[in-house]
Structures are given as structure tokens and as C-alpha cells.
Amino acid sequence: SGQYSFGL
């Protein structure tokens, strides 16, 4: 929990 990931 508390993990955020994103891809551009």
C-alpha cells in the first residue's frame, strides 16, 4: 500500500 507507478 502507498505505491504509485505510471508509464509515459
Swiss-Prot record:
Biological process terms from the Gene Ontology for this record are:
neuropeptide signaling pathway
Q: Which residues carry this modification: Leucine amide?
A: 8
GO cellular component term of the entry, any: extracellular region
Cellular compartments annotated: Secreted
**Looking at the record's lineage, which domain of life comes first?**
Eukaryota
Keyword annotations of the record: Amidation, Neuropeptide, Secreted
User: Main subcellular localization, coarse class?
Assistant: secreted
Q: What is stated as this protein's family in its record?
A: Belongs to the allatostatin family.
Q: What does this protein do?
A: May act as a neurotransmitter or neuromodulator.
Full protein name? Carcinustatin-17
